[in-house]
């Protein structure tokens, strides 16, 4: 992501966060229009560009660019199966801070190929989440596994249900009951 793109994303995020509480669809639409006018590529017509931004951020280990690229994806609802490869790599990487966002994307996409990385992420202790006594990332990964509903997802939930961590175990059992 170049400097101009970063500034455009940052302006969009500031404007969106400032106006978000109002839930004003007109203002949100204007923010999106202004972003598309000023950004290098019309991401609504070329979501592959956001994948490229994520791949570059991954190879450069640029946490800020991962965060901002995901923000573009969320703002314009771009996430699809085509994002799977890069997001699977990112959810296992330990140098950024957007694991929960990626787990939420996987929950929406319900892709069987994400089962293994979701399971690993549910168990991984990322340094920046050491304070999280509620294990939000693990819970989001468990809910994503529950949404996938394949035999492989069910097997991973069974393993998680045997966890010594009560929060992980309880959430995995709840997802198994829903399946």
Give the location of each predicted region.
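Intrinsically disordered, serine/threonine- and proline-rich low-complexity regions
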Residues: 1-52, 77
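Amphipathic alpha-helical scaffolding segments comprising HEAT/armadillo-like alpha-solenoid repeats
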Residues: 3-11, 44-57, 78-93, 111-127, ...
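Generic secondary-structure transition motif, activating predominantly at the C-termini of alpha-helices
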Residues: 17-20, 39, 54, 58-62, ...
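Structural detector for internal amphipathic alpha-helices that build alpha-solenoid repeat scaffolds
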Residues: 26-44, 56, 60-79, 89, ...
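A short, hydrophobic/aromatic-rich structural module that often spans a beta strand
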Residues: 155-179
